[in-house]
Amino acid sequence: MKEQKRISESLITESLTNDMFWVCLENEDPILGYVSGRIRHSFIHILVKISVSCYDSTRTRRRIIYRLRNKDSND
């Protein structure tokens, strides 16, 4: 059976080494996020979508699955 995941929009506040980021969620403490797939750039203060596993007991690490485009940016 495929694992159910919750996806939420978040903000990256700090870029760390090894494609890790501090991510602020809307009503939670900052968590450590890691990138998936082709999202391997050091962006700071960008909006992202986060995937949350139901089996993550610590809820401290989440997977960044998508970078949302800002309306005022040129990319």
From Swiss-Prot:
Name it. Answer: Translation initiation factor IF-1, chloroplastic
Species of the source: Cucumis sativus
Subcellular localization, as worded in the UniProt entry: Plastid, Chloroplast
Query: What quaternary structure, including any partners, is listed in this protein's UniProt entry?
Result: Component of the 30S ribosomal translation pre-initiation complex which assembles on the 30S ribosome in the order IF-2 and IF-3, IF-1 and N-formylmethionyl-tRNA(fMet); mRNA recruitment can occur at any time during PIC assembly.
Q: Which GO terms describe its cellular component?
A: chloroplast
Q: Does the keyword Nucleotide-binding apply?
A: no
Q: Domain of life of the organism in this record?
A: Eukaryota
Keyword set, alphabetical order: Chloroplast, Initiation factor, Plastid, Protein biosynthesis, RNA-binding, rRNA-binding
A single Gene Ontology MF term assigned here is: translation initiation factor activity
Q: Does the keyword RNA-binding apply?
A: yes
